[in-house]
């Protein structure tokens, strides 16, 4: 891939649910280090679009490219190691935080490195002792941070975020947002973030707005007044 070529490209992507047109003629690209938001009213297809980019569902029309290759021709497990998806409600499993953090290592058949765990816990303002904590005892903010750490350990090229702070209080929301922005800037990770949070617009390179009913889009560069 040439330097500064798009990591992701959506070309005329559409999605039908039965006879209902959810998305129509979606076209945009995402480059390394670029930060784009997806906004729009409820029911306009924001989460559906993110799931298509995450390769959790397939578009009914159009093409999704990753580094110039059609995602439908790539092995899903390889693609998802490069394009990481964080849902609005984090799904944690096993008994402890440690169980969740070793999972990315296990699927790669690699020996977990505790030093990496500890570095991420420090970055995301969590104590070392949380590794042995039962996931049922975690707060909403802690669960979301553990989910992010699990997804970021192997530095994906693209991070997909689906309203991940919508259920958090203002203090936790601010902390999680700042941690994400700081880390992705350091690592030059591309971000596609579905959100209703107007404060996040200040961080965006561009804002993709989906229209209701037809699921069509507009893309604009955000400029501070």
Swiss-Prot record:
GO terms for biological process: intracellular iron ion homeostasis; iron ion transport. One of its GO terms (molecular function) is ATP binding. The keyword Cell inner membrane applies. It is a peripheral membrane protein. Transmembrane segments: none annotated. Part of the ABC transporter complex FetAB, which is probably involved in iron export and enhances resistance to H(2)O(2)-mediated oxidative stress. Probably responsible for energy coupling to the transport system. Belongs to the ABC transporter superfamily. This is Probable iron export ATP-binding protein FetA. It comes from Escherichia coli (strain K12). The gene is fetA.
């Amino acid at each position: 891939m040439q330097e500064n070529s798009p990591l992701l490209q959506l070309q005329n992507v559409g999605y039908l649910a039965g006879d209902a047109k959810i998305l129509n003629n979606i076209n945009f690209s995402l480059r390394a280090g670029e930060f784009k938001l997806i906004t729009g009213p409820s029911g306009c297809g924001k989460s559906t679009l993110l799931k298509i980019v995450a390769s959790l569902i397939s578009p009914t029309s159009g093409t999704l490219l990753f580094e110039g290759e059609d995602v439908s021709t790539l092995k899903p497990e390889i693609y998802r190691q490069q394009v990481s998806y964080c849902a609005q409600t984090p799904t944690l499993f096993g008994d402890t935080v440690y169980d969740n953090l070793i999972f990315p290592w296990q699927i790669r058949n690699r020996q977990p490195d505790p030093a990496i765990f500890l570095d991420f816990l420090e970055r995301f303002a969590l104590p070392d002792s949380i590794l042995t904590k039962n996931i049922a005892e975690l707060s909403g903010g802690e669960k979301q941070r553990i989910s992010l750490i699990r997804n970021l350990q192997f530095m994906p090229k693209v991070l997909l975020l689906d309203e991940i702070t919508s259920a958090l209080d203002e203090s936790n929301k601010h902390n999680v947002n700042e941690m994400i922005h700081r880390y992705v800037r350091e690592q030059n990770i591309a971000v596609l973030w579905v959100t209703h949070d107007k404060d996040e617009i200040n961080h965006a390179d561009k804002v993709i707005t989906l229209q209701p009913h037809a699921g069509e889009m507009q893309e604009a560069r955000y400029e501070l007044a």
